[in-house]
Amino acid sequence: MKLDFIENYKAYTDKYFLRSKSILEQEGINPLVRYQVFTRHDIPSLSGIDEAVDFIKEKGRDIRIYSLKNGDSYKSGEPIMKLEARVQDLVDLETVYLSIMSGALTGPIDLKLLRKGVRASYTASQGKTILDFSARHFAPELVDKIARICQEEGFNGTSTDVGAKYWNTLGGGTTPHALFLTIKARMEQNGIQGNPTAEGARLFDKYMPKEIPRIILGCTFNKEISDIIETAETGIRIDGTRIDTCGENYTEGSQNIILPKLNVNEKYLRGKGVTIASVWGLRRGLDQAGLENLSIAISSGFDAEKIKAFVEADRVYQNEYGRELFNVIGTGSFGLKNLIMTTSDICAYFNAKKGLWLPMSKVGRFELPSKRLRRKQ
């Protein structure tokens, strides 16, 4: 008997990947792409890799798999795996293969301790909309259980259908980097001018039901402010933006932001990734462009301590400007210190007209060298 998360893997998949696949299928966009998988931990003996490969082999189609194997040692930042296939054959597999790897690498989870982290995150959110984005970080068999805990502790929703039943709804989400990178690959290959973020927003609005909020990811090309302004200026419907700037980058404009005195840990104020300065700059930039109506969703490492710091910044921002700094929090680690989270990113695409692989990644996540990977399929 097959495990449910293999047989019904789409129910365990972050909804934005399923929506992206639907958009790409309907628009006929299907370049050959390369993904890379890595983690930021040194690991003496890998686990879960062979099982993830088996899942990809079973559910994928015409996918070239290059990977390390269970038992191999691993150094932080090197590739664990690379995958090559048409994007429509890969994009909806990501959540589950990461879940298989992350779950095995982390090992057993104390659900009582996890519940404490969920409760602390909810309490820290102080009434903000807070969503469970944890599916890729935990073993597939825990996704349903964790979603239930989140619902019981007050969260507003989750990213997977298997978990969303506890809210009597379906999984929700925004838009992923993969959608905009795929669109950029198509534009590059065909010599099409334009903004991939704006084009992704246009296609999302074209194909997705009108009741789904148009929350557009703005950090793919490290133009968190200007890409969203440019998208809105085209007249495309956009309801908000999500900021998920990776730890390799400073958010656009954040280094020039002057912050008031804030009673929070300095590590949350400035630096790379999603910081208070980056969200402050994004809100001010959108407002100054006349886009006060756009909501802001924040994600990337938001445990209870980080949420509390951002909520304090929101309080100060509201006192100064009379409106919220941000509106929605996406979280998934819940403060658990032993989590080993794997990440998967598009890093290249095959340009058929030129007959060669070309770099294609979100800014800061360029392709990593890989001498130890071996072909599995």
Question: Language-model segments: which ranges?
Answer:
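Glycine- and Gly-Pro-enriched alpha-helical subdomains that act as flexible
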Residues: 170-278, 282-286
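Active-site loop/helix belt of alpha/beta enzymes
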Residues: 268-276, 280, 284, 289-298, ...
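Structural preference for beta-strand elements that scaffold enzyme active sites
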Residues: 130-132, 170-172, 213-215, 238-242, ...
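Catalytic cores of alpha/beta
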Residues: 224-233, 302-320, 324
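Glycine-rich beta-to-alpha transition loops that act as phosphate-gripper elements at the mouths
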Residues: 135-138, 218-222, 296-306, 332-334
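Ordered alpha/beta subdomains of enzyme catalytic regions
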Residues: 1-209, 287, 318-323, 334-377
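Conserved catalytic-core segments centered on acid/base and nucleophilic motifs
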Residues: 74, 80-83, 294-307, 312, ...
